[in-house]
């Protein structure tokens, strides 16, 4: 837990290795386990070779926080899964990294899904959408407009899925 705060307050880098970010979200999820007990669990999977790819710090946590906040009331157990894998997209010869944050909650409502996946920038509303808006803006600044892609979907089994596709650096 002190590691969690150290990462938050001492990290001034634009990009960090995936392994550092995964260690950070593990610390964050352990704090959430203390908070929610048996109604919360998590899984983290990273494909071999992705650990040294550099990504923006706190990027994954932003979407994990949203999953926890919007999943449900924790009357039913929730699982949050984070997957990181190599991905070749759109015929590009260079590789990308795909980050997925999935949960077993209630998923996105159709109007929220439509809004999140539209090309229209999100406007923060009453303290909501600030994390998502900041993440999108950071990705555009770091990688260039349209080079990093975020899509939002609902899983067939229920729950939400956020997929982030980044150039492998």
Question: Language model features by range: what are they?
Answer:
Residues 1-149, 159-161:
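Two-component histidine phosphotransfer core
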Residues 107, 168-169:
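Short, surface-exposed beta-strand-loop junctions and turns on beta-sheet-rich folds
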Residues 160-168:
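Short C-terminal beta-strand
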